[in-house]
């Protein structure tokens, strides 16, 4: 399959995201009137019960150590929007330096991870998974720390859910989101 990296990046740079229909597998661009953002400032909240795991040595963090395994982990659900075509797109974006995996490990075991796309100072979180309890939560906290250190200004989680709300996620309307996204696209940041 030939992937048009430029066209894919243009879609993300306009605030859209790709999803496959769970039943047909057909891929389409989706937009939302409000984007769920993970704050990269003092509004981010690490739940108290998670803090010992974040500070401890239970999980080790790696970047892009097992990208394809993270994609597979994110797709391994009874109903998934990550089709085989979308997996190939993620791999092409990864090979081009735009898609990344942020992983938690226990020894040689991939415990969990987050899949996302970095464009300028924006990180668009596509999906996350875990195989060991709390692994994806620790990955989220450590990813926020990493993005802060690298100068990122936007962590787009796309759609709100109660899990993200526990970490301080908030909704931003489309117009404000577009303005922030366009600012971030002009700021060079290196993810890894």
Swiss-Prot record:
Q: Where is the signal peptide?
A: none
User: Where is this chain primarily localised?
Assistant: cytoplasm
Q: Which SUPFAM superfamilies match?
A: Acyl-CoA N-acyltransferases (Nat)
Recorded catalytic activity of this chain's protein:
N-terminal L-lysyl-[protein] + L-leucyl-tRNA(Leu) = N-terminal L-leucyl-L-lysyl-[protein] + tRNA(Leu) + H(+); N-terminal L-arginyl-[protein] + L-leucyl-tRNA(Leu) = N-terminal L-leucyl-L-arginyl-[protein] + tRNA(Leu) + H(+); L-phenylalanyl-tRNA(Phe) + an N-terminal L-alpha-aminoacyl-[protein] = an N-terminal L-phenylalanyl-L-alpha-aminoacyl-[protein] + tRNA(Phe)
Q: Name one GO biological process term.
A: protein catabolic process
Where is the protein situated, by its record's location annotation?
Cytoplasm
EC identifiers of the protein: 2.3.2.6
- Please provide one cellular component term from the Gene Ontology annotations of this protein: cytoplasm
Task: Show the InterPro entries listed in the entry.
Answer: Acyl_CoA_acyltransferase, Leu/Phe-tRNA_Trfase, Leu/Phe-tRNA_Trfase_C
Keyword annotations for this protein, in alphabetical order, are: Acyltransferase, Cytoplasm, Transferase
Would the keyword Heme turn up in this protein's UniProt record? no
Q: Which GO terms describe its molecular function?
A: leucyl-tRNA--protein transferase activity
Describe the task this protein carries out: Functions in the N-end rule pathway of protein degradation where it conjugates Leu, Phe and, less efficiently, Met from aminoacyl-tRNAs to the N-termini of proteins containing an N-terminal arginine or lysine.
What the record says about family reads: Belongs to the L/F-transferase family.
Q: Could you tell me what this protein is called?
A: Leucyl/phenylalanyl-tRNA--protein transferase
Q: Supply the source organism for this entry.
A: Synechococcus sp. (strain JA-3-3Ab)
Q: Which gene encodes it?
A: aat
